[in-house]
Amino acid sequence: MTFQTFKNCVIAIALCMMAGVSIKAQEPSQMQALIGQSLSKLQQQTPDAHLNCIAELKRVEAMFPDSIQPKYQMALQSLSFSVANPKAEQTENLLKEAEQTIDKMEQMKGADQSDVCTLRGFLYMVRIVQDPAVNGQRYYMNVMQNYEKALKINPNNQLAQQLQQKFLEGMKQATGSN
């Protein structure tokens, strides 16, 4: 009888451990599904859709606080909203939150530093878009250094390449250079 109890206890422990492993294995796919669901809101290119997406990404980040991907997407979408709507009332808070998120990501083990530098460069780029006359000279080097560092770490970082190109084109237009 004791052996049967022991056997049942071992089976119960094994099942609990397997369930725990199964739940942990499902977390990344569940997280990815939630992120994808949030990003699908961006099919409507409206400020409200963008803000709803960001709010959902914040909830996903709260569910998975040790994961980098929700933080990355939340910061990226906050910056995307801010560059498209530099004078919106939500922009300043979104930029502060994005900066805090980038700072957190920078300290996280396993964070892609190329992505962190890209986001930081994008943050400074948005600051320039907000007020080019004041922030252009202040943040120009920060933008360039962050994109260059991102591309030095990962030369295949498509977002860093695209943002750097857009920034250089915008600066040429702003200064009248060819």
Regions found by a protein language model. Give the residues of each.
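N-terminal leader/linker segments that initiate helical-solenoid repeat arrays
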Residues: 23-64, 68, 72-73
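Short coil/turn linking the two alpha-helices of tandem helical-hairpin repeats
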Residues: 38-47, 80-89, 121, 126-135, ...
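Helix-turn-helix repeat elements of alpha-solenoid scaffolds
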Residues: 43-58, 90-101, 137-141
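Structural marker of alpha-solenoid helical repeat scaffolds
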Residues: 63, 108-109, 153
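Residue-level recognition of tetratricopeptide repeat
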Residues: 67, 112-113, 156-157
